[in-house]
Amino acid sequence: MNKQDPKRSNEPPVWLMFSAGGTISAICFPVLLLILGVLLPLGLVPVENIVAFAHTWFGKLVILAVTIFPMWAGMHRVHHGLHDLKIHFPAGGWVFYGLSALYSVIVFFAVIAL
């Protein structure tokens, strides 16, 4: 017997943000560590090039992707990790995903203001 009004879940959009964050972290963070942690301090990449890239529309898009999506992945892991440890935070989904949404809005306006 099928239900006439199935309950909608918020999991698909949250899992989308979680998986995007994990994928972007795995692909981009090693490159960022190489550029910002090794090549920049050694003087092999000029700071002016990084700043110029950050001021382009593509650079801003990269900064947004590298900062927003991993936050969603991290908050999703914290939320489900606490649940797995039987620590039930009141309205945990609203708190963790709400903080991620607030962070996303703040980062969006900060990057646009670059």
Swiss-Prot record:
Gene3D superfamilies from the UniProt entry: Fumarate reductase/succinate dehydrogenase, transmembrane subunit
Membrane-topology descriptor: Multi-pass membrane protein
Transmembrane segments: 27-47, 50-70, 94-114
Recorded GO MF terms: succinate dehydrogenase activity
InterPro entries in alphabetical order: Fumarate_red_D, SQR/QFR_C/D
Localization per Swiss-Prot or TrEMBL: Cell inner membrane
One CC-aspect GO term: fumarate reductase complex
Keywords: Cell inner membrane, Cell membrane, Membrane, Transmembrane, Transmembrane helix
Membership in a protein family: Belongs to the FrdD family.
Name of protein: Fumarate reductase subunit D
Source organism of this protein record: Actinobacillus pleuropneumoniae serotype 5b (strain L20)
Lineage: Bacteria, Pseudomonadati, Pseudomonadota, Gammaproteobacteria, Pasteurellales
